């Protein structure tokens, strides 16, 4: 039987789903208003399918504002949260990436066989008389896709604006930007050709980072007119603190 492997067809998967849902609620009165939204996005990768490359995002946002004492004082807040979870294939570069091997590997080389020394179901061309330089792009992709990334970000602020007299506005805003991310990966021992192998050691890696930025901004502005001229003045200060 002549082997005729369509490597491109093997790498790409049909019917990769994308799902997107959102819910928004808005309301208010003469002195108050609010806006709330929820969202979810899921996208399966067309290369390798959902078990190899998959993206999920959850997001939440809420904004409110209230006017007090006949608009003399205005207070409010903004808050948003985003959580992203994804797995993905190795991107590499123009010379070495997951898909490049699929374009150059011989169609006479099979995807699966029982000749792999590490009990992998994917074919190893090392001992082939003709194709030992060809790797197994599908086997490489499925073996090296053991990674998971989690990212979350929280942005929020509260503010107050005071107008003691007409055209004079004094405003104070305190905000925080918090982030946290984690990445985990696992690479087993493998061999797929004389050039594509990892026989040194199994490796596991985990990275984590988090931090936040706090910002406090205070401004005072006064608007007035002189004849046909409109003039705006403002003074302010801002303090920023970062930790991470």
Predicted feature residues:
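Surface-exposed loop/interface segments of Gram-negative outer-membrane beta-barrel transport/assembly proteins
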Residues: 1-3, 46-53, 59-155, 173-244
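Charge-patterned, long linear interaction tracts outside catalytic cores
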Residues: 157, 161, 168-174
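Residues embedded in well-ordered regular secondary structure
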Residues: 1-54, 141-144, 160-165
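Outer-membrane beta-barrel strand-turn architecture
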Residues: 28-29, 68-70, 162-168, 224-227
């Amino acid at each position: 039987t002549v082997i005729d492997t369509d490597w491109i067809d093997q790498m790409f998967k049909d019917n990769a789903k994308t799902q997107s849902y959102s819910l928004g609620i808005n309301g208010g009165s003469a002195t108050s208003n609010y806006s709330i939204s929820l969202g979810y996005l899921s996208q399966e990768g067309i290369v390798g399918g959902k078990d190899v490359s998959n993206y999920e995002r959850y997001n939440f946002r809420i904004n409110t504002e209230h006017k007090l004492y006949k608009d003399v004082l205005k207070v409010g807040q903004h808050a948003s949260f985003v959580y992203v979870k994804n797995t993905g294939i190795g991107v590499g570069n123009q010379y070495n990436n997951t898909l490049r091997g699929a374009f150059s590997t011989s169609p006479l080389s099979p995807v699966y066989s029982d000749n792999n020394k590490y009990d992998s179901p994917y074919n190893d061309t090392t001992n082939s008389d003709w194709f030992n330089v060809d790797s197994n792009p599908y086997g490489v992709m499925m073996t090296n896709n053991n990674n998971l990334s989690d990212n979350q970000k929280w942005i929020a602020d509260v503010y107050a604006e005071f107008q003691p007299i007409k055209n004079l506005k004094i405003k104070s805003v305190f905000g925080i930007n918090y982030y946290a991310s984690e990445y985990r990966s696992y690479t087993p021992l493998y061999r797929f050709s004389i050039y594509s192998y990892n026989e040194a050691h199994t490796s596991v890696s985990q990275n984590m980072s988090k931090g936040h930025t706090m910002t406090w901004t205070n401004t005072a502005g006064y608007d007035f007119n002189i004849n046909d001229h409109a003039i705006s003045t403002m003074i302010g200060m801002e303090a920023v603190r970062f930790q991470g």
